[in-house]
Amino acid sequence: TAHPLAFLSGWTAAALISAALIFVEMRARSLRHHSGLADAMVQQAAEQFLPSGIAGLLLAVMLWKFAPETLWLLPGLWQVLVSLGIFASARLLPRSVALVGAWYFIAGFTVLILGSADHTLSPWTMGVPFVIGQSLMAALLHIASEDTDAEP
């Protein structure tokens, strides 16, 4: 894209909206299944994911301010950081969520390899991997929720 600031702003807004929705759902799920421990569990999961999120934000700012010619790296780096955040939070989530972490890890490095050919910042390198990753996460959490609800 020819407008890196618009790219960064758009994806930052998408990340914030996504984080808010995840927080609301995580809190509701935690209250349903772990009523007394809900706040502690949500806080612990957020604390484990937060370093990856902060690193992604700082990477974006640093590359934009000091090395704008390398902004094409951001989509792949963000995906790798999301994978690390998921792996860090995995012990509080259903085991199958590790597959989502693996998806983002592989997708991130694939995006870096593909982007290295022309060094362009494309919305597709963010959109496609995140739609697949978030859909996979939603499906796995839904399946895990059904399994938990079915237990006596």
Model region roles, listed by residue range:
Residues 21-40, 84-92, 135-142:
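C-terminal ends of transmembrane helices
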Residues 1-58:
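Selected alpha-helical membrane-embedding segments in polytopic membrane proteins
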Residues 29-33, 66-67, 144-149:
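Membrane-interfacial segments
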Residues 88-152:
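Terminal transmembrane helical module of multi-pass membrane proteins
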